[in-house]
């Protein structure tokens, strides 16, 4: 991965450095201001990855079990869970290997570790791109279901949804390979940052438009039923709060990582940017947190999916 400063790479574990513990420190910087550096222990990475892994496996299992959930919308949610699952698997795998190398329980040559590191980087990058794409696909699906409700089933068909899903996975794999191969090229980094900004703008426009339509619909109902205006205001505030949470989580979890990529291009040698580079591990942890939050926002709010999830858990016991 193209990072500067502190970074989680398997090759660094061959030096058998002591494992990190969670801490907030002001790292001295002789050429600039003091840097606030958040140290993330490997155990925390492992714990976050395992929680995300369990959550997203349950989402995939529930959707696979219930035939009522075999629709384009839930297929997009399932693919988002698979993307987050890959983020978790790559994180757990990398952390476990790093801990084994540091403890001396695993002996490996540098060349083998380098190849494993490259594979994990491809997994991480591909899952990040696919996760962003499926978040956009879910937003588009919801938008069409609201604004083109009568034509929804003719527009969003299963064959069309499968083609979109296949295209996203192929594009994600190709993007990750290009990113890992040409990560030191400025154009590649800028394209990734531009892709994130485009996804953020797309989601913001679609969800704001959906909120406006929902508020208009609430006004129409209130007018027909001759209700008072405060009811509409309460609905609007609730919708605005939901929208703020949805977009806020997306921006807070993904924004720092892409800010990191932007600063690599804009100011790789500046002391202030160097302070931000030191917190790369924190940015990765936030992405893993997003993989934990996604099922809560997009999957577990469905009553049908929650019911199926209870059946899956009962069967497992």
From Swiss-Prot:
Subunit structure: Interacts with MGRN1, but does not undergo MGRN1-mediated ubiquitination; this interaction competes with GNAS-binding and thus inhibits agonist-induced cAMP production. Interacts with OPN3; the interaction results in a decrease in MC1R-mediated cAMP signaling and ultimately a decrease in melanin production in melanocytes.
Residue intervals annotated with topology Extracellular: 1-37, 94-118, 184-191, 267-279
Pfam family for this entry, one: 7tm_1
Molecular function GO terms recorded: melanocyte-stimulating hormone receptor activity
Entries under InterPro entries matching the protein: GPCR_Rhodpsn, GPCR_Rhodpsn_7TM, Melcrt_ACTH_rcpt, MSH_rcpt
Subcellular location: Cell membrane
Name of the protein in question: Melanocyte-stimulating hormone receptor
Chief site of localization: membrane
Role played: Receptor for MSH (alpha, beta and gamma) and ACTH. The activity of this receptor is mediated by G proteins which activate adenylate cyclase. Mediates melanogenesis, the production of eumelanin (black/brown) and phaeomelanin (red/yellow), via regulation of cAMP signaling in melanocytes.
Lipid tethering residues (S-palmitoyl cysteine): 315
Gene: MC1R
Cytoplasmic face of the membrane: 64-72, 141-163, 212-240, 301-317
Family: Belongs to the G-protein coupled receptor 1 family.
Glycan attachment points: 29
Entries under Gene3D superfamilies matching the protein: Rhodopsin 7-helix transmembrane proteins (1.20.1070.10)
GO-annotated cellular components: plasma membrane
Transmembrane spans: 38-63, 73-93, 119-140, 164-183, 192-211, 241-266, 280-300
Domain of life per record: Eukaryota
Membrane-protein topology: Multi-pass membrane protein
SMART domains membership: 7TM_GPCR_Srsx (SM01381)
Keywords of this entry: Cell membrane, G-protein coupled receptor, Glycoprotein, Lipoprotein, Membrane, Palmitate, Receptor, Transducer, Transmembrane, Transmembrane helix
Cross-referenced SUPFAM superfamilies: Family A G protein-coupled receptor-like
């Amino acid at each position: 991965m193209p990072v500067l400063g502190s970074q989680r790479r398997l090759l660094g574990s061959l030096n058998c450095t002591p494992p990190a513990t969670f801490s907030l420190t002001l790292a001295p910087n002789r050429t600039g201001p003091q840097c606030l550096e958040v140290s993330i222990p490997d155990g925390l990475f492992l714990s976050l990855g395992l929680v995300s892994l369990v959550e997203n496996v349950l989402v995939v299992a529930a959707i696979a079990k219930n035939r009522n959930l075999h629709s384009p919308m839930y297929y997009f949610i399932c693919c988002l869970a698979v993307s987050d699952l890959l983020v978790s698997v790559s994180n757990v795998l990398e952390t476990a290997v790093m801990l084994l190398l540091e403890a001396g329980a695993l002996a490996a040559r540098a060349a083998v570790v380098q190849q494993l590191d490259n594979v994990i980087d491809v997994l991480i990058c591909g899952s990040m791109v696919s996760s962003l794409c499926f978040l956009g696909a879910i937003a588009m699906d919801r938008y069409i279901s609201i604004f083109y409700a009568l034509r929804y089933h003719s527009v969003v068909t299963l064959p069309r949804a499968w083609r979109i899903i296949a295209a996203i996975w192929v594009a994600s794999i190709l993007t990750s390979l290009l990113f890992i191969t040409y990560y030191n090229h400025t154009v590649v980094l800028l394209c990734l940052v531009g892709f994130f900004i485009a996804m953020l703008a797309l989601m913001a426009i679609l969800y704001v438009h959906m909120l406006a339509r929902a508020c208009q619909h609430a006004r129409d109902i209130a007018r027909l039923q001759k209700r008072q205006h405060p009811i509409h205001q309460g609905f609007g505030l609730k919708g605005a709060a939901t929208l703020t949470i949805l977009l806020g989580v997306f921006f807070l979890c993904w924004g720092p990582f892409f800010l990191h990529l932007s600063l690599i291009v804009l100011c790789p040698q500046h002391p202030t940017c160097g302070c931000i580079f030191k917190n790369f591990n924190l940015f990765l942890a936030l992405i893993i947190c997003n993989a934990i939050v996604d099922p809560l926002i997009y999957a577990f709010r469905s009553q049908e999916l929650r019911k199926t999830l209870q059946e899956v858990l009962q069967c497992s016991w």
